[in-house]
Amino acid sequence: MQKFLGVLTILVCVFGGYMWAGGKLGAIWQPAEFLIIIGAAAGSLIIGNPPHVLKEMRQQVPATIKGPTEEYEYYMELMALLNNLLETARSRGFKFLDSHIEAPEQSSIFLMYPLVSEDHRLISFITDNLRLMAMGQMSPHELEGLLEQEIEAIQNELLLPSRSLQRTAEALPGFGILAAVGGIIITMQAIDGSIALIGYHVAAALVGTFIGIFGCYCGLDPLSNAMAQRVKRNMTAFECVRATLVAYVAKKPTLLAIDAGRKHIQLDIKPTFNQMEKWLAEQEG
């Protein structure tokens, strides 16, 4: 809703102001200029990015526009899942968790928490590191270093689409100038025409510059920024898992290990310790 409000504000202010000053919307509709700018931008994205980055971009763009949903419930489920796994490991040993770790999509434990189970990247992170913990003794410091490196690698990978889109946004004014230069060439070919005809062609050429600047600063630039912020916000779940597992390896009680992870959750959705404790008690009950 917030993003749609932002888009509406941009459209009303930019085009409303243009019309208020006496401009006509029909003059901005220049399909050839749009084709040049959008085609050049799309082509540069395809040339400059491997397929997996483009695929991730196709997933991130609609998710960013849609906005976050059920974040509070997601983190409550995450803490309950970690509590369930670590309590089981403490009471029955990691050997008991082997079947759950190897096939989380079929695990009765993981399937209890559908919001988290849908996040395949996070589930893979949890199972891989539980497997690592089960293989042998590892100091909290060693585990923390490994987890930090893995989280950094995941974040850098997930930020590639937003960075690529940001570079494309920066190039849009240039693509707009490209379209405008093409329009000027057409204008010069009609230089012996009437003043009205020349004015029409010049106006059409300037639309390219207008659309390039508009697309950059009112479109792709804020979208790429929102995508980057979404990735960094989603990485909180990984930080939560990291802090929990490190605290567990440091021999902290399970509840305190879960609380170590809770402290990494964003303030606007972070439950209090009492809320977390009550939720975990209800899940165990």
Curated annotation (Swiss-Prot):
The keyword Cell membrane applies. It is a multi-pass membrane protein. Keywords: Cell inner membrane, Cell membrane, Chemotaxis, Flagellar rotation, Hydrogen ion transport, Ion transport, Membrane, Transmembrane, Transmembrane helix, Transport. The chain crosses the membrane at residues 4-23, 34-51, 171-191, 201-222. The gene is lafT. PROSITE patterns: MOTA. This is Chemotaxis protein LafT. Belongs to the MotA family. It comes from Vibrio parahaemolyticus serotype O3:K6 (strain RIMD 2210633). The keyword Chloroplast does not apply. Induction: Under conditions in which the polar flagellum is not functional. NCBIfam families: MotA1 (TIGR03818). Its main location: membrane. One of its GO terms (biological process) is chemotaxis. It is found in: Cell inner membrane. Residues 223-285 are cytoplasmic. Required for rotation of the flagellar motor. Probable transmembrane proton channel.
